[in-house]
């Protein structure tokens, strides 16, 4: 275990109210990443509790409450709560009778979150960290979004007002866009939050189709178009994707066209574009080139201090240290010889060692000692390269010098009512299982309104772990999936655990075996074996309030 490692609570822990934040503070965590559905009013109060608060501010969001989506695991056997979401919410759905929705068939697909204009409210509240979704996004996307937020933060602390310019907003939309909303964070309603028409990147509209002939589409542009831009024509039964490899204007091949120009672009015919359809730009090569130039001109480099020793009869030695105290030392394979003619100068050593090549470092301080020696540049370069490589390894490894630490949990063992589901081949043994009714605490309790007055209760999240319940069992919504999680919940007062519905028989057996081997007794555990499974907890109703049931096009849902 790592007693000095800072602990952060993931959004998948479904911490969405003040009692959850208070509980995790008392557990010694450094930071809580709140559920993405948490409104600003609760965030403001959470920031006063005395633990760092991190909030989602930009990027893809889920329609289900954070940590409460079982649809991906149910349909694709991939846990959305453990980083393997199959994105079932981005699929097409119809009513059970097969009829379609007038707003679009992507009824579960939300727009992306973008609260850049609301940033002062979050900073005023005391939020410590802004979380920006960037999984599987290109580096240019990360650069542009981070640059935008960095500029906004700097303006805020300069006591000025920041608004995203129309040009920057356009750039963000070109990078990735399926609509923006303020989400639940600032109380956008369901019509403002959903992207039912399309679930994927739509970019910006740049023109309208005039005609299609012989593998070319004629378009009147409303914005700039550059050669090799990525394009999409909104079409049915699916959109037409293309690249502006060849652009013709007045029968001449050009590499750029501007608003109001009429151009022909080579275009696939499946499906063939029709007059009046909208042309959208999904990749802007001009923007990407600008970002690449910015990244090269203003690289983010890590400052280093460097020392060297160049003494006769010893290996050449280089020591580097970063601002966080990581240190690396490298020595040459050969021994330094005394100079027979002109000795290498310290200026030459400094010039050679100051080059960092492909490593993201900047030498801000360099000094050392050198005698009258012969030292080839190749040896200086190789020793410097080794030192930087070792520093890379040191920075990527969390090192603790505290020695082996004991690890112990005070488990609430209840031996007279122990119950275990044992999986042997295809049989299930329910001997000694007790069957009784238990009250299930609300999965969503933002305002801490629910007061427990029951002796037997199913708790829904860590927000309910307060050691005041007489007899509580962790419900499937807590998504407990390994022996350590079981032990922790039992140590906090739970008398039993219902395994996550994402787990199969073999996974349950492995968790129980590991628990028994580690702690020496069999925990009281349950598993859902009959009844309808809740696959999503959604904060409010669909856009169509008359919807009672939906189905996907593959009859899996």
Report residues per predicted region:
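Alpha/beta enzyme core
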Residues: 18-27
């Amino acid at each position: 275990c790592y007693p000095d490692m800072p602990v952060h609570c993931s959004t998948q822990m479904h911490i969405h109210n003040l009692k959850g934040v208070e509980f995790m503070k008392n557990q010694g965590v450094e930071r809580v990443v709140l559920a993405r559905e948490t409104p600003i009013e609760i965030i403001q109060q959470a920031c006063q509790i005395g633990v760092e608060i991190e909030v989602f501010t930009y990027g893809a969001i889920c329609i289900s409450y954070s940590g409460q989506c079982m649809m991906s695991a149910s349909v694709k056997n991939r846990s959305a709560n453990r980083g393997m979401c199959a994105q079932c919410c981005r699929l097409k759905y119809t009513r059970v009778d097969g009829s379609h929705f007038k707003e679009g068939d992507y009824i579960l697909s939300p727009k992306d979150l973008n609260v850049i204009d609301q940033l002062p409210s979050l900073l005023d509240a005391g939020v410590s960290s802004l979380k920006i979704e960037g999984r599987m996004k290109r580096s240019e996307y990360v650069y542009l979004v981070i640059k935008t937020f960095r500029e906004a933060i700097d303006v805020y602390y300069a006591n000025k007002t920041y608004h995203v310019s129309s040009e920057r907003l356009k750039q963000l939309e070109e990078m990735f866009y399926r609509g923006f909303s303020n989400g639940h964070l600032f109380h956008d309603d369901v019509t403002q939050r959903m992207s039912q028409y399309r679930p994927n990147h739509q970019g910006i509209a740049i023109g309208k189709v005039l005609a299609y002939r012989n593998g070319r589409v004629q378009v009147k542009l409303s914005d700039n178009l550059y050669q090799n831009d990525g394009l999409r024509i909104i079409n049915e039964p699916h959109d037409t994707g293309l690249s502006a490899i060849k652009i013709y204007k007045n029968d001449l091949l050009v590499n750029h066209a501007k608003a109001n120009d009429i151009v022909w672009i080579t275009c696939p015919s499946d499906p063939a574009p029709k007059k009046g359809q909208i042309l959208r730009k999904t990749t802007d090569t001009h923007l990407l080139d600008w970002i690449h130039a910015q990244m090269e001109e203003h690289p983010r480099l890590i400052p280093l201090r460097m020392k060297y020793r160049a003494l006769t009869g010893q290996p050449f030695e280089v020591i580097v240290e970063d601002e966080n105290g990581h240190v690396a030392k490298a020595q040459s394979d050969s021994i330094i010889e005394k100079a027979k003619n002109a000795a290498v100068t310290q200026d030459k050593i400094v010039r050679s060692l100051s080059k960092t090549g492909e490593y993201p470092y900047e030498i801000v301080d360099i000094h050392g000692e050198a005698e009258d020696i012969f030292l080839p540049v190749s040896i200086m370069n190789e020793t410097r390269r080794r030192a930087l490589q070792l520093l890379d390894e040191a920075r990527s490894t969390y090192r603790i010098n505290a020695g082996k630490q004991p690890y112990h949990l005070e488990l609430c063992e209840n031996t007279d009512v122990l119950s275990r589901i044992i999986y042997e081949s295809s049989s299930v043994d329910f001997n000694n299982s007790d069957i009784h009714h238990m009250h299930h605490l609300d999965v969503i309790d933002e305002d801490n309104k629910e007061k427990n007055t029951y002796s037997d209760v199913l708790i829904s999240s860590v927000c309910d772990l307060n050691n005041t319940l007489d007899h509580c069992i962790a419900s499937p919504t807590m998504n407990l999936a390994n022996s350590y999680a079981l032990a922790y919940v039992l140590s906090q007062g739970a008398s039993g655990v219902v395994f996550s519905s994402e787990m199969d028989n073999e996974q349950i057996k492995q968790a129980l075996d590991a628990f028994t081997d580690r702690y020496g007794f069999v925990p009281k555990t349950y598993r859902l074996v009959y009844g309808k499974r809740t696959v999503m907890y959604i904060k409010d109703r669909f856009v169509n309030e008359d919807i009672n049931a939906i189905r996907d096009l593959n009859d899996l849902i």
